[in-house]
Amino acid sequence: KSAPKHEWIGKNSASWALCRCNNNWVVRHNSKEIPIEPAPHLRRVGILLDYDNGSIAFYDALNSIHLYTFDVALAQPVCPTFTVWNKCLTIITGLPIPDHLDCTEQLP
């Protein structure tokens, strides 16, 4: 919650990001970029927040491949933020979908 509201995600000490830049993937935190090698062809990204043990991990969710883990000291609530430039974004929590929701759209 302490991240500046008008600043790119990953450009400060209160946010972490996985970004695609020119067909390469990087993780960002506090204005530092670390390339993910080799550059994966990601179709689905998994994010695991372990608040109690202080880590945020990014995964290739389709292939169950770990991409990067940040060790973090969290003192405030964490708010997920997602940005997609020109494609579709679907958020899956890993929890079962309640029966009362109409979920007719199929994932590719």
Curated annotation (Swiss-Prot):
GO terms for biological process: regulation of microtubule cytoskeleton organization. It is an enzyme of class 2 (transferase). Has E3 ubiquitin ligase activity towards IGBP1, promoting its monoubiquitination, which results in deprotection of the catalytic subunit of protein phosphatase PP2A, and its subsequent degradation by polyubiquitination. Its main location: cytoplasm. The keyword Transferase applies. Residues 1-100 form the B30.2/SPRY domain. Its EC number is 2.3.2.27. The lineage of its organism: Eukaryota, Metazoa, Chordata, Craniata, Vertebrata. It comes from the Eukaryota. It comes from Mus caroli. Belongs to the TRIM/RBCC family. GO terms for cellular component: cytoplasm; microtubule. InterPro entries: B30.2/SPRY, B30.2/SPRY_sf, Butyrophylin_SPRY, ConA-like_dom_sf, E3_ligase_FN3/SPRY, SPRY_dom. It is found in: Cytoplasm; Cytoplasm, Cytoskeleton. The gene is Mid1. GO terms for molecular function: metal ion binding; transferase activity. Homodimer or heterodimer with MID2. Interacts with IGBP1. The keyword Oxidoreductase does not apply. Gene3D superfamilies: 2.60.120.920. This is E3 ubiquitin-protein ligase Midline-1. Keywords: Cytoplasm, Cytoskeleton, Metal-binding, Microtubule, Transferase, Ubl conjugation pathway. It catalyses: S-ubiquitinyl-[E2 ubiquitin-conjugating enzyme]-L-cysteine + [acceptor protein]-L-lysine = [E2 ubiquitin-conjugating enzyme]-L-cysteine + N(6)-ubiquitinyl-[acceptor protein]-L-lysine.
